[in-house]
Regions:
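N-terminal Rossmann-like FAD-binding beta1-loop-alpha1 element of flavoenzymes
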Residues: 2-30
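Active-site/ligand-binding neighborhood in enzyme catalytic cores
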Residues: 94, 110-227
Length: 407
C-alpha cells in the first residue's frame, strides 16, 4: 500500500485524492490549512446568508476534458445556466455583449469607425500579424477596438502594455472574435452549469472516507532515505508520495525568488429582485451574468451578478453583486513572463523523489475545473512511471502533466 499525502483540499487536491484512491491501493491523508476544504471553489455567504463565489462561478468544458460533467454528476446535480458576458467600453457607453458583435458595435458612438476597420481587415484577407499582442489585435479587430476593449484592461490587470505581451496571449483567449450578431457566451461553446446547492456539497461528498486534517499548515517537504516527509505545524508525516497543490515557490522556500501573480480583491453589494437586471441584458433579453469594465479610469475589472448565476432567469429575492478590483497580493493568475523562474522550481521539485506539484498553485498554470481534471488524469496515467524514474525523467513527466496553455 502506498502512503500518500495531499497538500491542499481545493479541487485539484480533492480530485487527485479521489482519482488515486479509485485506481490504486493507497492510504491518503489530506492536509488543508483553512478551516474548511474547497479552496477558491467554495461557495461563501454574506452576513445575511446570500451566496457568492470568489473563484470559479460556473462549470463548463473550456479547454480541458469533457469527462468533467459526468465526474461532477457523481457528487452533485448540475443546473444549466445561460451565462452571457457583457462589456462597457467607456463609462458613457451602453453595455454590449462580449465578445463584441457588429450588430451591437454599430450602436456605439465609434461604431462606424470600428466597422470600417473590420471591413478593411476582412477585405485584405491576410492572416493576423503576430509580432506581439498589439500587432495581433490591431490586425484582427482594428485599432479602435484594440484600444477600447483591450489596451486599458491589460495595463490595469496584467500591468503590461499590449506590445510587451505575446500574440499567443490573444490567440489562447480567442480575442479576435467579432461575429455579425449574437455570440454572447463565454469562450466555451459547451453548456454552462451551476451545482445544485453551490460548490460546497461537492467537497463534502468527494472527501467522504478520507483523513482530512483542516487547520494544518505545511512548512516544508524533505527527502528522507525511505521516502519523503511533510513538515507541518502539527508534526512530521512520512509518505511515499506527496501531491502538493500549495504554491510551488513557497513549498520550496523561495529558492529562486517568489513567482509573480495577478489577482483581485472583491467588493460586495446586494441588489433586490425588483431592481431589474443588475448588469443589463443582451439583445435577446437574457441578463448578463458578468460585465467587464476595461478602461483605466476604474479599478474594477469585472462585476458579477450572482442572481443570474445562482437562480437563472426566474430569479427572486436579493442577490450579491460582486466587483473584482486588481490586487497583486492575491495569487490567482500566473503570468507568462515568469516561465523561466517557474521551470527552475519544477526542476527542483523533480529532484525530490515522490514529490508531485499539481494544480494552479503547484504547476503555476491558469486552470478551470475541466483542465484540472485533465491534469489529474494525466498524473494518474503516468504515476507508475514517475515513481520509478530519475530526476530528468520526472521533470519531463511533470511537464506533460502540466500540459500547455491550451490543455
Amino acid at each position: 500500500m502506498i502512503e500518500i499525502v495531499v497538500i491542499g483540499a481545493g479541487f485539484a487536491g480533492a480530485c487527485a485524492a479521489w482519482t488515486l484512491r479509485d485506481q490504486i491501493d493507497c492510504q491518503i491523508t489530506i492536509l488543508e490549512q483553512s478551516a474548511e476544504p474547497g479552496g477558491m471553489l467554495r461557495t461563501l455567504r454574506t452576513g445575511d446568508g446570500l451566496p457568492y463565489e470568489y473563484g470559479p462561478r460556473v462549470v463548463s468544458v473550456f479547454r480541458g476534458t469533457h469527462d468533467i460533467i459526468p465526474f461532477l454528476q457523481r457528487f452533485v446535480g448540475l443546473e444549466e445556466r445561460q451565462v452571457y458576458q457583457g462589456t462597457r467600453l467607456l463609462p458613457e457607453y451602453p453595455v454590449i455583449p462580449f465578445p463584441v458583435d457588429l450588430e451591437s458595435v454599430r450602436a456605439l458612438p465609434c461604431g462606424r469607425r470600428i466597422e470600417r476597420e473590420l471591413t478593411a481587415i476582412r477585405e485584405a484577407q491576410t492572416p493576423p500579424r503576430e509580432t506581439n499582442l498589439r500587432d495581433y489585435l490591431e490586425s484582427s479587430v482594428g485599432p479602435t477596438l484594440t484600444e477600447l476593449a483591450f489596451e486599458g484592461f491589460n495595463r490595469k490587470f496584467w500591468g503590461r502594455r499590449l506590445e510587451d505581451m505575446p500574440a499567443e496571449w490573444g490567440k489562447l483567449r480567442r480575442l479576435e472574435r467579432v461575429s455579425e450578431s449574437g455570440l454572447f457566451r463565454l469562450p466555451s461553446r459547451a453548456p454552462h452549469y451551476y451545482p445544485s446547492g453551490g460548490f460546497n456539497p461537492l467537497f463534502e461528498r468527494m472527501l467522504v472516507g478520507f483523513d482530512v486534517r483542516t487547520g494544518t499548515r505545511v512548512t516544508g517537504v524533505r527527502k528522507e532515505r525511505r521516502g519523503i516527509e511533510v513538515v507541518t505545524d502539527a508534526g512530521v508525516i512520512a509518505a511515499d508520495l506527496v501531491i502538493a497543490t500549495a504554491p510551488v515557490d513557497a513549498l520550496l522556500e523561495y529558492e529562486f525568488g517568489p513567482l509573480e501573480w495577478r489577482g483581485y480583491r472583491i467588493e460586495l453589494d446586494v441588489v433586490e429582485d425588483d431592481a431589474g437586471p443588475g448588469l443589463g441584458t443582451a439583445p435577446d433579453g437574457v441578463p448578463f451574468a458578468w460585465l467587464y469594465t476595461p478602461w483605466l479610469g476604474t479599478p474594477v475589472c469585472r462585476t458579477t451578478d450572482f442572481g443570474v448565476i445562482h437562480q437563472g432567469p426566474g430569479r427572486s429575492g436579493p442577490a450579491v453583486l460582486l466587483r473584482e478590483i486588481v490586487d497583486e497580493g492575491v495569487p490567482m493568475y500566473p503570468v507568462w513572463w515568469e516561465d523561466r523562474r517557474f521551470y527552475k522550481y519544477l526542476a527542483r521539485a523533480a529532484r525530490i523523489p515522490g514529490l508531485v506539484p499539481l494544480g494552479r498553485l503547484g504547476l503555476y498554470k491558469y486552470v478551470t475545473m475541466d483542465s484540472t481534471l485533465a491534469m489529474v488524469q494525466r498524473l494518474a496515467e503516468s504515476l507508475e512511471s514517475y515513481l520509478g524514474s530519475d530526476a530528468g525523467q520526472r521533470l519531463e513527466i511533470l511537464r506533460s502533466v502540466r500540459g500547455d496553455w491550451q490543455t
